[in-house]
């Protein structure tokens, strides 16, 4: 009888673990992850990136994103497709897919949920995208080091992901040593990207 109880307890534990019920106590406030194209500080408790750094260096465009989808990484608790389902939040790349279209391997890395933020669809497809395009013009002349910092509101989705309140992108020009920073509220933009500059 005692053996049967032990077996049942073990099966219950394994079942709960498979469903993720035991993951919550081990979630990290911040974990640093280095890839070959970006370094990200990710909050598993918020299910969002909190800071990300990448270099933009005039890479040739050799591949298209096609039907690539975001994917979860092993060993990290991130957001997932449910957080973006039927709402105003886009899966916003922090390190842009178009900047790393020089190889299929690099492009795929940009589709990790570690590189994905809950971003207002009008911001993601509007002024944020236009600033990314401008970065790729600037990096024709000199390499850029781009740092993105994410701030958060108190809003949490029913799916448990925290909503960012703003995104600050600082672009360092490595030759001229100039830095330009832009802060965007996570809402529908009401002005040109240039007007979001804060320094």
Predicted regions and their residues:
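Domain-level detector of nuclease and nuclease-like folds
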Residues: 74-199
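Short, extreme N-terminal leader segments that mark the start of a protein/domain
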Residues: 22-33
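Sec-dependent N-terminal signal peptides
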Residues: 4-14
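Hydrophobic alpha-helical membrane context
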Residues: 14-15, 105
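Generic detection of long, well-ordered alpha-helical segments
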Residues: 30-31, 43, 49-50, 110, ...
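Boundary at the C-terminal end of the N-terminal hydrophobic targeting segment
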Residues: 16-20
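Short, His- and charge-rich active-site/binding loops that engage polyanionic ligands
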Residues: 31-90
